[in-house]
Design a protein with these regions (language model features):
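The conserved Walker
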Residues: 11
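Conserved catalytic-core segment of NTP-binding enzymes
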Residues: 100-213, 226
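Conserved lysine of the Walker
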Residues: 15
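Hydrophobic positions on the alpha1 helix immediately C-terminal to the Walker A/P-loop
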Residues: 18, 22
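Loop/turn-to-beta-strand initiation segments
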Residues: 87-91, 120-121
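Hydrophobic anchor at the beta1->P-loop junction of P-loop NTPases
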Residues: 7
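N-terminal phosphate/diphosphate-binding loop that engages ATP/GTP or pyrophosphate donors
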Residues: 25-79
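Switch II (G3) loop of P-loop NTPases
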Residues: 64-69, 89-105
Length: 252
């Protein structure tokens, strides 16, 4: 049975990193894999920039037109239809970073509904250190909005709480506490807890309730960035509609 993962979440939650990890893991298991970049909101993290890596692993990558050209008006390619029409084992969608971004995947509602029962997982990637995800109420609100715009029911959450190079043991623990409460209030289960192996191992050793951990997922980092340089470039660009918004860590 074809397995389709739709990864959605707020800015800086780590969707793209997880999408790559999901795809690489599937390919290493010998599965025919397609990876689709539908993030029409955040042009900073583009799967296209890892095109050589995906090609080496025989993963088909579908990206927005002009994704690496510096042109900010992106359009969804017609090749997205291949996710449903072709005989893949694993398909991963990396979807835009807010309710508006989730709209890009909403146009394929009928295609998703025609998938075999159990084939689709819609996963909300949550990083409680990022904007709009620092409280239970914020996580719930964004989750509800994304479901409406994506026209898909979220089937699980991923605790991917981190602060990039400043991550400590506190991140996954704090994410666990908030996401556990969201799960209790909404009924949406925690499907995965993800992070670098050293942090994940120490978190798991603390003995938290496995119901709110889901499947532990140790991830590798592929999307390296010079955060300070990028933040300055956003602030200096008058055409940027959200200067500094994506990457502030003091808003949680």
């Amino acid at each position: 049975m074809k397995k389709v993962y739709v990864l959605i979440g707020n800015y800086g939650s780590g969707k793209t990193e997880l999408a790559l990890n999901f795809a690489f893991r599937a390919a290493e298991q010998g599965k025919r894999t397609e990876l689709l970049d539908l993030d029409m909101v955040n042009t900073y993290f583009r799967l296209t920039e890892r095109g050589k890596m995906t090609e080496m692993k025989e993963i088909r990558l579908v990206s927005p037109n002009f994704a690496c050209s510096g042109i900010e008006t992106l359009s969804v390619p017609a090749e997205v239809a291949s996710a449903f029409a072709m005989d893949w084992d694993t398909v991963i969608f990396d979807v835009g970073g807010d309710a508006v971004g989730a709209t890009a995947v909403g146009r394929y509602h009928q295609d998703f509904m025609e998938l075999e029962e159990g084939a689709l997982e819609v996963l909300n990637v949550v990083n409680v250190r990022r904007p709009l995800a620092g409280t239970v109420e914020r996580i719930e609100k964004l989750q509800e909005e994304m479901q409406i715009h994506a026209r898909l029911r979220i089937t699980g959450m991923i605790n991917n709480t981190n602060l990039a190079g400043m991550t400590t043991d506190a991140e996954l623990r704090d994410g666990y506490e908030l996401i556990r409460e969201v799960s209790q209030r909404t009924g949406v289960p925690v499907a995965y807890t993800s992070g670098k192996k050293e942090f994940l191992d120490r978190f798991l050793a603390e003995g938290h309730d496995p119901k709110y951990i889901g499947t532990p997922l140790a991830i590798d980092t592929y999307m390296q960035r010079d955060w300070d340089s990028w933040i300055h470039s956003l602030s200096d660009n008058p055409s940027n509609p959200r200067p500094g918004v994506y990457y502030r860590t003091d808003m949680a």
